[in-house]
Amino acid sequence: MSFTPTLLAWYAEHGRHDLPWRLTTDPYRIWISEIILQQTRVSQGQQYYERFVERFPTVAALAKASEDEVLRLWQGLGYYSRARNLHAAAKQIMEGGGDFPTNYADVRALKGVGPYTAAAICAFAYGLPYAVVDGNVYRVLARYFGITTPIDGTAGKKEFAQLADSLLSRTAPADYNSAIMDFGALQCTPTSPDCTQCPLCESCQAYRQGLIYDLPIKAKHTAVGERHLLYLFIHDGERMLLERRPAGDIWQGLYQPLLVEYQQPTSEAVMLADIHKVLRQSKGMAIQTPALQFRHVLTHRILHLTCYAIHCPTLPHLGNMQPVPFAELDNYAMPRAILKAMEQLRIGR
């Protein structure tokens, strides 16, 4: 049995047929699921998907929402540009008459929709013959066919896209795409794949040549930057000061307490001196010590956070900071790192 029929037979028996976005052909819901599942595990993504489509069941409902409301529902997923792009694309659809696009070019033209997402929507919603190529697909194809072309270069992307298209079932594109993605997620996993139970192992080039852990190949190595952030959780026992993060940086549009950023590791003594400079007009302030310090890892950045809870009997006026009652903090979308710090510092309890 050749590659595609074997894959479809495996999927019929082992595939994740009960995932909610596989039980619908609604392009809106499939779009939402595909955006959420970028950089997100299925188990976590399913919870967010169900909450998202319950709150915004249609394109119109999403388009009418405020950005703050969308970001708040997205809180904890990271990569917040995905949520902003979803919101912008929903408005784009409504401006075009309110009907979700039905062909690849128009789907691809939506804000934040790349080739993979457009192919997935067209295949899963409309049964059009487009092959998806994600991390799972790269891994399965690279191993099975023994491809050593780096997957992150122009040549590799073209080679894998052409190969995926040649293998696609024209009569069942949705099933084929689901099959190869599930096969990569469940069988041909990045680590510890169970090759002895694999229906493709006899003709798998990586298995035959002992290259399972060498494929696929990536050529580029993105440098990881480090940032040193001092966060001041200034409160009066009932309210805390927050500001919205600026555009063009991590966590754009989310809320945070007062931030002081350093270019290099800095001693607590220097940070405490800076706190007193910033809050020199605040009488009776009490700084909770020791500071909470932890590391937060993003895709291409490592953040070193130092966090102080500071009680001020009278909240100071500091730039664009606004006082937010503890009871309303849940209405403000904040980065996961800030929520973690608030919990450990027991802010708002």
Regions found by a protein language model. Give the residues of each.
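Catalytic cores of DNA base-excision repair glycosylases
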Residues: F3-T196, L200-Y213, H276, R280-G284
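Intrinsically disordered, low-complexity, charged terminal extensions of DNA damage-control enzymes
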Residues: M1-H17, L23, A185-R349
